[in-house]
A protein has these predicted regions:
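Extracellular/periplasmic helix-exit of transmembrane alpha-helices
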Residues: 1, 105-123, 180-222
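Loop-to-transmembrane helix boundary motifs in multi-pass membrane proteins
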Residues: 19-20, 56-65, 180-191, 197-198, ...
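Selective recognition of specific alpha-helical transmembrane segments in multi-pass small-molecule
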Residues: 26-34, 70, 90-107, 154, ...
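Hydrophobic alpha-helical segments and their helix-loop junctions in multi-pass secondary transporters
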Residues: 34-38, 42-52, 58-74, 93-130
Length: 288
């Protein structure tokens, strides 16, 4: 669709009213995702033991640093910052995931067996420990499939698709890029899910105790250092900080492009400033 944003595609195939609904919904989604990915990495970075009692242990410091980067990523052409950094981030993800997968094969941990998965559908699933609802009472159906789906494709990913489409030089690259990315991310999700199951033999209560203690960052660090030692710990720290930021920068960039597409606003420097500054200013005040 020539790199059109999601509301534009909805308007093309449905009508202008549906386009308006999608525009509002998409803009809200992108904005709040961006805000979350200011607060999340800032919190993770400021809580690192290495930064204790220094300016780097100040949450506001990291919020401002991340906002400054988001401003540049939102304003500047995509080939100036984002495409320069993302290959390195992608390499980090590939190296971490491959290393974890190899470590799992070498260590060959004892994993719980699913057993008869179809037993879940004939009401005898409570006999299988792995299929019991977790202590919070959340059922495995449909939450398991929500989790798996988010590892391969999600509503947020669909808002990022136009950015990639506008970077492709030929339509023949569409299938290998989009389908390949979906398959790769699915594999990454499966490897980390397997690593998570193996790293917490005590099951969900053990995982929840660590989440309550230090959040997802501590869990990633525990898994990475457990399988890869000191090197894994270093990669985990970088990954936990960097990967949320790569979602936040494209969220705000997509928000600007979605508004520009909807109202046919020329992308002059002045117009980009008039859009980016208020959006990021509001985002900052929402982090306070």
């Amino acid at each position: 669709e020539d790199g059109k944003s999601l509301p534009e595609i909805a308007g093309h195939y449905f009508n202008i009213y549906f386009k308006g609904v999608m525009l509002l919904f998409t803009a809200m989604l992108l904005f709040f995702v961006g805000v979350v990915f200011i607060m999340s990495p800032a919190g993770l970075l400021s809580n690192l033991d290495y930064f204790k009692d220094t300016i780097f242990g100040n949450n506001t410091f990291w919020v401002l640093v991340i906002l400054a980067y988001y401003f540049l990523a939102t304003m500047l052409p995509i080939d100036k910052i984002i495409t320069k950094l993302y290959p390195a981030f992608g390499l980090l993800m590939i190296v971490m995931t491959t290393s974890i997968a190899v470590a799992l094969l070498i260590n060959a941990p004892q994993l719980p067996e699913m057993g008869d998965v179809f037993a879940y559908f004939n009401h005898s699933h409570y006999n299988n420990e792995l299929l019991e609802p977790n202590p919070d009472g959340l059922p495995i159906w449909p939450l398991l499939f929500v989790t798996i789906t988010c590892g391969a494709i999600s509503g947020f990913h669909s808002t990022q698709a136009p950015i990639i489409a506008r970077c492709l030089t030929n339509e023949k690259y569409v299938r290998p890029v989009y389908y390949g990315a979906m398959v790769c991310e699915g594999i990454v999700a499966c490897v980390w899910a397997l690593a998570g199951v193996a790293a917490f033999p005590g099951g969900y209560p053990e995982l929840k105790a660590m989440l309550d203690l230090g959040g997802p960052g501590l869990v990633v660090n525990h898994i990475a250092t457990g399988y890869l030692g000191v090197l894994g710990g270093v990669m985990a720290i970088v990954a936990v900080a960097v990967f949320p930021i790569t979602s936040g920068d494209t969220a705000f960039r997509s928000l600007r492009l979605t508004i520009v597409d909807a109202f046919n606003i020329p992308q002059s420097l002045r117009n980009r400033l008039l859009l980016s500054v208020p959006i990021l200013a509001i985002a900052y005040f929402m982090t306070l």
